[in-house]
Each structure stands twice: as structure tokens, then as C-alpha cells.
Amino acid sequence: MPQDDGPELIAFTPDPKAAAQQAQDQPATPEGDGAAEQPPMQGPPAPGQTGQAAQGPQAPGQGTPTGPKAAPGGQTVPPGKPQTPPQEGTGFHPFRERKARAEAPPPPDAPPAQLAEEYGLGLQALKGKCTAAGVLSAVLLLFALLDSGVLPVLDSLLPANILLLGSLALFAGCVLLSLDVLKEGLVQLTNLAPNGDTLALFAALFTLVDGVTMVFTPLRESAIPFFSPCALVLTFHLLGRYCDRSAKFQACRVAASVSQPYLVTQDPNVLGGRTAFRKWLGVPKGFGSQIRTTSQAEARFRRLTPVLLVACFCLSLVTTVAHHQPNLVFWSLSALFTAAATLGVSLALNLPLRMLGGKLAKLGVALAGWPGLLAGKGGKAALLLDQDIYPPGTVALAGSRVFGSLSMERTVAFTASVIRASGSGLTYLFDKLVRAEGSGYLPIEKIVMQETGLLGQCQGQQILVGNSDFMSRQGIALPPGIRAKDAVFCAVDRELVGMFVLKYTLHPAITPALQSMVLHRIAPVMVTRDFNLNPHRLRLWGRLPMDQLTFPDLQRRVTLSGPNQPHGPAILAVLCREGIAPFSQALIGAKRIRRAAAFSSFFVNFSACVGVVLTASLSSAGALGAMCAWHLSLFLLLWLVPVLLISLWTTQY
């Protein structure tokens, strides 16, 4: 679409409601609405403060005596010399201010296309590994059920040695399929930043050692080691890695699908000092860095991991060696680390992001990682432009007519030039009309915007463009018999020269999108420039919830919808499609995923702590029958249920 620098001046007609609206948005001062804060005035000193200071000691709260100041140590500092602050010594300081830990630098940025290729490499192979590991875990879970004695009919179905050897072989296969998880756990351990994969690494190691010792040297009762619960841990950790890479691959692929997408940010000081969501055309700088950033849910569990590591080792030694049960040390370590690793560590954020990310990708929405989800926190308003309510293609030309001596080409040139200079949403339609008529744009020198029309100056001629109400207020008579409600009229030097009948088609997704925003406590704010989109016209169309929409005055709308606005530091989402549906889905999806990750993180951390305490208690009693592989598997699966339900909840709206 051709662009120009616009007119030299955009003026506004006085609006009696603008002052009242501005007074409501600005906080009132004690001296009135127009009173500004004044700096404290320094007048002459009060009586009793002039002259020389009294000799002798002074009580706290009295004025400081004039003259040379006494420095620490009894030395006198001249008046013109700055006083050196006292240095901290090595004495006793009961209250020391703890220095804040330096934040880690953000990951390096990369183009979305490069990241999409990186995350897509080997994604199908990882999906196959998850499927195979899930099948092996299901078979191991069946073997654990046979060994538990819950169903006496199945006790003699397979011999104990066959169950043990078969379970060991299947678990070894599951370990081989989960080498990516174990490698990541080892890397994080060597970097002194252990995480959930590190706990899974120790759980697999001690479970294998316990199984091998059971085969060659039966140190305890003939019970299957914790192959089944540990295999579940490895499988769900592997599934979390797949969900993470798949969600990032989808987001990067969508963000790379267009060269200049819309960026969604939460901008400061938009509505009376409050923030608001805004979408604007730009280059997604920092999107790759945000995608690579560690989530807050993972960071919380990473802070808990060292505590769980120390607790598992210490409690295992206390409950076995200290209780004269050294033969149960590997069994206890296997149980403790398996319970600490849990099943939902890597699914707290990745599962809802994967489930809802696929739905958003179909709408052309790419969420910008965890920093983008945090960027949407606290936002309660969203700015909607003309293109959001009526995207390109939903406003069509139903008919046109020329009055007077001007040709259609000249009439289209005048009308399209004024509309483009105003930044109205009708620019797309009239740009197509200009190209269809073989016309061109004219330079607009000045423009005055009113609620129902536009006044422009072009080459010494006055151009009036507006609806029928605007023409009536300007004293321009319309031909009899014209009843076009959504028409654009054009007058040159107060002579009517043309009429363009428009047809506005409201997309079926507009009303549900607005209702969803209102239900999620995000107030839509209309910052339109199309003179046909006023509250009265929108109310007549009857399909929009006008009582829940905010419609500022014209000057505020033009200011908020103008270019070069200050934007927030983080990108919330990247949009590759027009309309309000992708915009609203991005805001709502980010809010729901952020809440789901917070709730799931709580259940994951709590279940890890509870699991360590319970397994330590049963280990101290040597309760091999109460803490068997089947029971521990059920314990882990039951604590996974809240995470699954919360993840499913994110898509139900």
C-alpha cells in the first residue's frame, strides 16, 4: 500500500466531552483540577533561626550549629570541604543488608526461522521415543500389578524370577530411550544447577543397581524393584521434553511465516497512567531470546532440587544404615529419588503450552516464551483499531455516484487522499479503488478531524469527506431520495462531488472474541478513526456488547492509535493475521497458560516433598510390602492428575 508522510497538521474540533473525560482520567489535586505540583518555596528563616547557634550540647531534633563540622575521630572539617562518610569497619553488625543475586543474562537472540529449523530437527524421532517408552512403562506397570498381590488370581501367573528378569530388561530399554533426559540431568549436575532431570538420573541409577543386586545377590525379600515408577518418571520427563520442543517449534514456525508481523506488548501510561495491550507492526527482535528463557515453574523446582538431593541421601542413610538395615540402602535410594523426581516436573508449563499452542498456531498466534507470558500479567485493557473490528475485506463498496462536473477519477483521488491522511480503517478499501480507477493520491496540506467527518486542504481547495450527518452540519444539501446509512460523501469547495455507498460486514468471530475478553477481565478500548464507527452506529448494528466497550473521545483515540508509541520491554505474542480474534486469543491464552503453570508448579513441588517424607517413613520401617512398585506408581500417577486436569482446563473457554 503506498504511504506518504501525511499532512503537516492534524487538528481537532473542540469536543465538550473531552475536558470532562480528561478530568476523570487525571487525579485531582487539593487546589483544583488545573493546579500543578509546585516545588517547596524557600523563604526567609523563621524568627529564632537566624544568628549564631547556642553554645553547648544540643538535643536531638534541634538545628545543626553553623561553622566547621566535626568529622568522626574528633577532626574538624573546613566548611568548603565535603565530609567523608564513615567507612564500615570489621566490628559487629547484627543487621547486614543482603546483596541481591545478580540476574543471569538472557539467552542469545536468533531469527524465528532458524529456531524453527533447530527445534524441528529430530522432533518426530523424539515423539517415537516417547511412544515406545510409554509402551514399555505400561508393560512394567502390569508386571508391578502382578507382583503386588492385589489380585490373588494373578499371583502364580508368572514365576518371580521371570518377572524380575523381564522387568529389568524392559527397564533397561526404557533407560536407553530416555538417554536425552539422563544426559541433560548429568549436564545440569556438572554445572552445579541440578534440576528434575538430575533427580531422574539418580532414580534410574539406583533402580538399576537395586535390580542388578537383586538378580545376583538377593539382599532382601523377593520383590520387584521400582522399575515401573522409575520408568514412568523417565517417560513423562521425556514427554515433557517433547512438549517443550513441539510448542517452541510451532511458535517459531508461525512467527517466521510473515516478514513483518504484528507484535503484542503491554505498553505503559496509556489510559490515565495505566497499562494496556496494544498490537503494532514491527520486527520481532528478542523473540528468540524469550523462547529460550527458562520458565518460572522450572526455576522454582530447580531451587528446590538441591534440598531434595540432600534430603534423599541423608534420609536414606538414616532410615537404613542407622536402623541396622544396610541391605535396603539401594532400595531406599531408588524409592526416595523416584518420589522426588515426580511425573509433572517438565509438564507444568510445557503441557498446557503445547495443548493451547496448537490451537493458537491455527489462528496465526505465536506466544513469545515465558517472558511473554509474564509480560501479560496485570493487563486489564486492550486497544482495538479499525482493522480489529472490521479487517480488510469486511468493508466493501456497494455503489458509487458522481455529482457535478468532476470525473470519477478526480473524485476518488480527493476522497482517498483525505482518508489516507486521517489514518482511517477505510484506507485499504479506497486504495483498491484508486488502483481500479487508475487514479493517484494528492498531497494533503492540512486536515481537521471531527467525529463524523474530515476537513482537508489540498492544492488550495477545501475537501470535505464524511457521512450524511457531517454534510448536513456543514450546510451541504444532499440530493433528495438518498438514504444511505453507511455512505461516504465528498465535497470540494462546499460543492458535493461524489458518494460512495459502503457495506460493513461484521465477521462472526468478532462478537465472541469481545465477549471472551470481557469474561477474562480485559476491557476492550475502541481507538478507531473511521467516522462511521461511532457508538451510535455500533449500537444500531446491535451485535456488539456496547455497554462493556470503552469509547474515548476523538483526540484520545487518534493519540492512542498513532505511530511511535512507547512499548513494553517484552513481546507477549506475535500475530500473523488481521482481526480481533488472534489478538484476543493471544491475550486470553497467555493468561490461562500462566495461571495453569503456577497451579501445576505448586502441586509438583508439594508432591515431591510429600513423596520424600512418605517414602522415608516407610523405608525406616522396612515396609517392603506397603511400599512396592505398584503402590509407588499409583502414588505418582495420582499426583499427576491435578497437572493433567489443569492443563486440560486451559483449552476450555
Where do the PLM segments sit?
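Basic, amphipathic juxtamembrane/active-site segments
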Residues: 394-417, 508-509, 514
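N-terminal targeting leaders characterized by basic, low-complexity, disordered sequences
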Residues: 1-95
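ATP-binding catalytic core of ATPases
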Residues: 403-454
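Hydrophobic alpha-helical transmembrane segments
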Residues: 172-181, 230-258, 268-381, 529, ...
